[in-house]
UniProtKB/Swiss-Prot annotation:
This is tRNA 5-hydroxyuridine methyltransferase. Belongs to the class I-like SAM-binding methyltransferase superfamily. Cation-dependent O-methyltransferase family. Disulfide bonds: none annotated. The keyword tRNA processing applies. It catalyses: 5-hydroxyuridine(34) in tRNA + S-adenosyl-L-methionine = 5-methoxyuridine(34) in tRNA + S-adenosyl-L-homocysteine + H(+). It comes from Bacillus subtilis (strain 168). Homodimer. Binds magnesium, but the ion is dispensable for mo5U forming activity. InterPro entries: Cation-dep_OMT, SAM-dependent_MTases_sf, SAM_O-MeTrfase, TrmR_methyltr. It comes from the Bacteria.
């Protein structure tokens, strides 16, 4: 992440209202155990968008330990959230965390690879919001697979589309090569998304970058 980009995020995070202790405990656990969760500033923007949109049903691709799903459920008391996690340990942690927050009646966790669960997830479609926050190299595949399950006025939100600001730099020399390929994949996804014939997209440079995509009328 570039110094300037990081400074801006730090500034925004310093302005945020304190979060409940149980939420801060999740954040501390994620940091200690290197679990990727949304950056705080990006999370607040996501919640603001959801509070305006007031979705009744949300699909999240990439549960991790349940942090984002829990934050969304707390913000939207009447929303149902369906979320997918392929890592067995994180799936178990997410289920336990959701129960601790007493949200297991509204947050439903699928275990498995999102690329293989479309049929199961389709049963509870359509979704008013689809939130993509899983394997970055598969973003375009996730979009293709789940976009048909979006409600007519729904939005698709993708996290990490700026990837520490690296997509805006000359990433041809990034090492290791695996990281370079991942940055290239995200850059490719951004260009594809911005030129999608059926969606209009805005990219918001907050957190690690959010793309907000809505069907064209």
């Amino acid at each position: 992440m570039t110094d300037r980009y990081e400074q801006i995020n730090d500034y925004i995070e310093a302005l945020l209202k304190p979060r409940p202790d149980n939420v801060k405990r999740l954040e501390a656990y994620a940091e200690e155990h290197h679990v990727p969760i949304m950056e705080k500033a990006g999370m607040e923007v996501l919640l603001q968008i959801l509070s305006v949109k007031q979705p009744k049903k949300i699909l999240e691709i990439g549960t991790a330990i349940g942090y984002s799903a829990i934050r969304m459920a707390l913000e939207l008391p009447s929303a149902e959230i369906y979320t997918i996690e392929r890592n067995e340990k994180r799936h178990e942690e997410a289920v336990n965390n959701i129960k601790e927050f007493q949200l297991d009646d509204r947050i439903h966790v699928f275990y498995g690879d999102a690329l293989e669960l479309a049929d199961a997830v389709h049963v509870t479609a359509p979704y008013d919001v689809i939130f993509i926050d899983a394997a970055k190299g598969q973003y375009q595949n996730f979009f293709h697979l789940y976009e048909p399950m979006l409600s007519p006025d729904g939005v698709i939100i993708t996290d990490n589309v700026l990837f520490k600001g690296l997509v805006a730099e000359d990433y041809s020399k990034i090492e290791p090569k695996r990281r370079r390929r991942l940055v290239a994949k995200i850059d490719e996804y951004n260009h594809w998304l911005m030129n999608h014939p059926d969606y209009q997209t805005a990219i918001i440079p907050v957190g690690d970058g959010l793309a907000i995509s809505k069907k064209k009328r």
